């Protein structure tokens, strides 16, 4: 795989995470750069690991992973999105109990995993082409780290504009990302 193709692959793999990061940034109360970078590093690390795992799976059974990856991504993003919408609606009636401006590591990790399912599938495909999987995985992880960090900071602007409804917007973004993943895989299979 040539360097230009690898760059485009890395950027394409980071787009779902970028969209989710916009939602995360919108749901945070004025995230600081360090919070955005922390989120970017979590997403980037997971997005680095999943193509390597996919590549390993591809060495064994490519068709199996391809048949269920989009359903896992859709389900995880749907559940996380609905949870964020619920929390956004709940905040209208109840005082916020959590520390503003933070998301737990596990929420971020599950979201990152859900948005990296496509990278897992790409890793499966990379098992059948001439590519250094470690270079490809590091490129995908670096692009994701940068894109997510930027996405969280841009999401902050969105959060300021929509106020209390920011978490609802973030949940809707996750559901849209999950639905898009499902739609793209189902229409590609048809």
From Swiss-Prot:
It is found in: Cell inner membrane. The chain crosses the membrane at residues 3-23, 41-61, 69-89, 105-125, 133-153, 168-188. GO terms for cellular component: plasma membrane. Keywords: Cell inner membrane, Cell membrane, Ion transport, Manganese, Membrane, Transmembrane, Transmembrane helix, Transport. Pfam families: Mntp. GO terms for molecular function: manganese ion transmembrane transporter activity. It is a multi-pass membrane protein. Belongs to the MntP (TC 9.B.29) family. NCBIfam families: PRK11469.1. Probably functions as a manganese efflux pump. This is Putative manganese efflux pump MntP. It comes from Pseudomonas syringae pv. tomato (strain ATCC BAA-871 / DC3000). The lineage of its organism: Bacteria, Pseudomonadati, Pseudomonadota, Gammaproteobacteria, Pseudomonadales.
């Amino acid at each position: 795989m040539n360097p230009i193709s690898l760059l485009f692959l890395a950027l394409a793999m980071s787009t779902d995470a970028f969209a989710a990061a916009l939602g995360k940034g919108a749901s945070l109360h004025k995230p600081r750069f360090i919070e955005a970078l922390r989120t970017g590093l979590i997403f980037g690390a997971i997005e680095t690991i999943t193509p390597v795992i996919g590549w390993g799976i591809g060495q064994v059974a490519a068709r199996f992973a391809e048949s269920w990856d989009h359903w896992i991504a859709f389900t995880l993003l749907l559940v996380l999105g609905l949870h964020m919408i619920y929390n956004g609606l709940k905040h209208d009636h109840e005082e916020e109990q959590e520390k503003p401006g933070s998301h737990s590591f596990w929420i971020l990790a599950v979201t990152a995993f859900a948005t990296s399912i496509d990278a897992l599938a790409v890793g499966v495909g990379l098992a059948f082409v001439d590519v250094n999987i470690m270079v490809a995985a590091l490129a995908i992880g670096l692009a994701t780290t940068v894109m997510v960090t930027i996405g969280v900071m841009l999401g902050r602007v969105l959060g300021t504009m929509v106020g209390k409804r920011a978490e609802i917007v973030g949940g809707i973004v996750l559901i849209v990302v999950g639905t898009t993943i499902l739609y793209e895989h189902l229409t590609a299979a048809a």
